[in-house]
Amino acid sequence: VVFDLDETLGYFMELGMFWDALKAYIKNKNSKKITIDQALFNNILDLYPEFLRPNIIGILNYLKKKKERNHCHKLMIYTNNQGPVEWAKYIMNYFETKINYKIFDQIIAAFKVQGQKVELCRTTHMKTHSDLIKCTKIPENTHICFLDDVFYPDMSNENIYYINVKPYVHDLDFNEMITRFLNSGIIDDPTSCRADILEFMKRYNYIYVGKTGAAQEVDKAVSKKILQHLHTFFKTKVVLSTAKNVDKSYNSTKRNKNVPNKSRTVKNRHK
């Protein structure tokens, strides 16, 4: 089973902004009481469950059982995220902590970041079956379930069950994010913290877009559909050459999904 990262497992753009702002704050204040590590990241992400696709932990627990029973041999992340590789590792490790299991076997990182080649086994920003085989060294005829919110033509063939999901996006207001952080007790001295972090995050010119209750119900329905498709993949082992469009029709605010190399670079988004 192969997962995309951004807008498939969750929505991590704002989290990335906050994480960068927090690191800058800790560095500028020369705070030795806070260690920037996986434990801190886990505590931060726990404050913002909205950034996780609904029931993604349940979905991963389902796949955990499949791996334990040897029904699923490998689980991978195949991403075009333009942040540092450690960013994807933080997110991967977070999920593994939540399910108490080392479920992911590999992260296939972006082909290039800022013009510099990162993942040496990749040949293109596009996700392709040939690059996947090359990077993972699995047999070419392996049956694969691939989940991504973008459709990549070269990831569609007779050996791939392609679950083309609706992108998951959930914005949080910056002030709300900072309030939750300050109320968490993670830092002992919050003096100037709000102003400093807010000032840093405003550099991104990020426009908050609220989410309706109806849209959140759609997200929950999509997650149920994902689980149904995974059941089908493991139960029948039937592979399809055409993508499974999981409630894409609900996506009335599609956000440049034809651009395959998703990035943490923020663009203005309007209602």
Positions of predicted regions on the chain:
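Alpha-helical substrate-recognition element adjacent to the catalytic core
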Residues: 2-116
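C-terminal cap/substrate-recognition subdomain and adjoining C-terminal extension
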Residues: 84-257, 262-269
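Residue-level marker for buried hydrophobic side chains located in beta-strands
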Residues: 1-3, 145-146
